[in-house]
UniProtKB/Swiss-Prot annotation:
Modified residues (N6-acetyllysine): 108
PANTHER family from the UniProt entry: GEO02494P1
Key words, A-Z: Acetylation, Phosphoprotein
Protein name: Uncharacterized protein KIAA1143 homolog
Region (Disordered): 24-63, 80-155
Pfam family, one: DUF4604
Length: 155
């Protein structure tokens, strides 16, 4: 058993005539066991290999309102500039959490409807200011409720 662990392969030197022949032909050796494990380096571009000129989609303008090729290039440049403005991730690799940016009241009400405790309390305040409307709402709600002893009272 111990002899089996001591066995190793020693690659002999390549003969001179083979090395000259391979050089003349332009032969490249395939990957070895050591080189297969190495990961290839990826280009530092934003990972958008489709940005190459021959791989871009063809722009066809059918109507006056369609985007032209120049407008598309401007939009792409704006997107790249916006990405450049963002802060790069920290060097130590830690994720930093920040408070979200507060929105103005106009943005909050732009078509979104969500119920929250504040809105409910605001509605209650409005209802307290107009008790007449509140009483009429209670009467409507009471008429829709089921009650078994109310027939004698109503008649």
């Amino acid at each position: 058993m111990s002899k089996r662990n001591q066995v190793s392969y020693v690659r002999p030197a390549e003969p001179a005539f083979l090395s000259r022949f391979k050089e003349r032909v332009g032969y490249r050796e395939g990957p070895t066991v050591e080189t297969k494990k190495i990961q290839p380096q990826l280009p530092d571009e934003d990972g958008n290999e489709s940005d190459k000129e021959d791989e871009q989609p063809q722009v066809v303008v059918l109507k006056k309102g369609d985007l032209t090729a120049e407008e598309v290039m401007k939009i792409k440049a704006e997107i790249k500039a916006a990405k450049a403005d963002e802060e790069p991730p920290p060097a130590d690799g830690r994720i930093m959490y920040r408070k979200p940016v507060k929105r103005s009241s106009d943005e909050k009400c732009s078509g979104l409807t969500a119920s929250s405790k504040k809105k409910k309390t605001n509605e209650d305040d409005v209802n307290k200011q107009s008790p007449v409307r509140k009483n009429s709402q209670k009467q409507i709600k009471n008429s829709s409720l089921l009650s078994f002893g109310s027939e004698d009272e109503n008649e």
